[in-house]
Amino acid sequence: MYAPGGAGLPGGRRRRSPGGSALPKQPERSLASALPGALSITALCTALAEPAWLHIHGGTCSRQELGVSDVLGYVHPDLLKDFCMNPQTVLLLRVIAAFCFLGILCSLSAFLLDVFGPKHPALKITRRYAFAHILTVLQCATVIGFSYWASELILAQQQQHKKYHGSQVYVTFAVSFYLVAGAGGASILATAANLLRHYPTEEEEQALELLSEMEENEPYPAEYEVINQFQPPPAYTP
């Protein structure tokens, strides 16, 4: 007997979704959080390379700007001799540099998770709840706190060693400080983009995976069913 096309297709083919389109899948990749993450990485790297972290005026220090690049590795003796900084300030600036490096690593890992969207459960939870972005925000806040502490120590040292008796001494933040603040703000935006995004439940994900496997097992293209409906029935045989 003749079986109508689509009801008993060879190989037990399963139907596609209406219109023959592929089943919708929930992508784990997120451009909305990857873009602020990239800005955060760029800002932190620039802050480390930029020599202008603190601006000094009115003291005996011959330098007008100080940064963490002055204390990475070799510290020039003139910085200590001219009372630009003391050993405690050097240590604080090195701690600031260490937290900047940690912030770059966390922000880079968050960026890679947002771009590639791995399906591993642990990595998926880490990305969805923006743990790496949150760590970047905390590290940027720590850098800002240590920068304020370092500025107070340098200000006190410059007030003790004024260039002239009536010199007005002040220490202000330079471009690198604001770059770190901007990196923290970008990480906050990336965190919000991940946390406010709607994700399917575990049951919905399992259903989507099952339907996707059924779709991949189809031995015939979607057009086969339409063509088969217009084929004439076979000749009658007694």
From Swiss-Prot:
Effect of residue 70 to N: In PCC; localized diffusely within the cytoplasm
GO biological process, one term: negative regulation of cell population proliferation
Primary localisation category: membrane
Compartment list: Cell membrane; Cytoplasm
Note: Consistent with the observation that mTORC1 signaling regulates cell growth and size in many species, TMEM127 knockdown cells are larger and proliferate at higher rates compared to control cell lines. In contrast, cell proliferation is reduced in cells overexpressing TMEM127.
Family to which the UniProt record says this protein belongs: Belongs to the TMEM127 family.
Protein name per Swiss-Prot or TrEMBL: Transmembrane protein 127
Organism: Homo sapiens
Lineage, broadest ranks: Eukaryota, Metazoa, Chordata, Craniata, Vertebrata
